[in-house]
């Protein structure tokens, strides 16, 4: 991508996501915008802005729209924690979303097929972007010891804390991870014609131990994810998209 300046916005659902993002990405210039805390960093041809959105779909969608209206970013990042829906995805692995599925929308039908309106794709849906991510994933594994997987995310404002629902989401949507907010951020970006990414780190296995695992693993997992995100944004990888 050739651009005099690339504007990147990062939507942080919770306090921990925002604080780790600010610290590890070395963001400063913290201020308040319409009741939201934001911070930023400019380096070479990259300008990154992070916003503390608040947890849940409404908070993250409204924060995404606020940032789009005020700053006109080229890219929006959905970031945060996720539960694993398959034994192939482990704690501290990073999942980069290809397609997100809103699974708990009442369409009056069984959870079998999601209408197109409830499916949103990221830039990793395109072959050229997949190749960039493949190169970056290999580099991250070799230099940082971090595992990055690309796949679908099931998104709904419902805790996935049992193997029945977990298996259903995996089988019917081919999803490898789940969380509350991804679809709301990606859909808001799509409706505004903004390219989107989703980097989500695994904190639990979407089973009966979900709450305990999420609480005990979250901070360490974020410490794994944000250095990777920092490299992707500021070390030239995003310029290749």
Task: List the model feature ranges, each with a label.
Residues 131-146, 188, 224-235:
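Generic non-transmembrane alpha-helical segments
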Residues 158-211:
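A C-terminal functional module that forms or caps the active site or interfaces directly
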Residues 84-173:
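Mid-sequence, gly/pro-rich, charge-dense loop/helix-turn segments that line enzyme active sites
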Residues 66-70, 88-89, 186-195:
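Alpha-helix C-terminal capping segments
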Residues 72-77, 175:
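Proline-aspartate-enriched helix->loop->beta-strand connector
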Residues 206-241:
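His/Asp/Glu-rich mid-to-C-terminal helical/loop segments that flank catalytic regions of hydrolases
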Residues 2-65, 71:
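N-terminal short beta-loop-beta anion/metal-coordinating cradle
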């Amino acid at each position: 991508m050739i651009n005099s300046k690339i504007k990147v916005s990062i939507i942080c659902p919770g306090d921990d996501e925002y604080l780790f993002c600010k610290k590890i990405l070395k963001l400063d210039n913290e201020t308040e915008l319409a009741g939201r805390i934001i911070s930023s960093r400019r380096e070479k041809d990259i300008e990154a802005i992070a916003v503390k959105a608040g947890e849940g779909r409404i908070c993250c969608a409204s924060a995404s729209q606020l940032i789009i209206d005020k700053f006109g970013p080229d890219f929006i990042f959905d970031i945060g924690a996720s539960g694993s829906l398959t034994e192939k995805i482990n704690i501290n692995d990073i999942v980069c979303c290809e397609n997100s599925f809103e699974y708990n929308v009442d369409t009056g039908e069984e959870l079998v097929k999601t209408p197109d309106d409830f499916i949103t794709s990221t830039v990793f849906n395109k072959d050229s972007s997949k190749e960039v991510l493949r190169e970056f994933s290999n580099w991250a594994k070799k230099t940082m010891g971090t595992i990055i997987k690309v796949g679908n995310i099931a998104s709904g404002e419902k805790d996935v804390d049992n193997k029945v629902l977990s298996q259903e989401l995996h089988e019917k949507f081919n999803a490898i991870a789940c969380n509350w907010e991804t679809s709301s951020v990606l859909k808001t970006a799509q409706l505004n014609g903004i390219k989107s990414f989703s980097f989500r780190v695994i904190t639990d296995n979407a089973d009966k131990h979900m709450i305990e695992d999420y609480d005990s693993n979250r901070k360490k997992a974020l410490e794994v994810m944000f250095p990777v995100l920092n490299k992707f944004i500021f070390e030239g990888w995003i310029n290749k998209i």
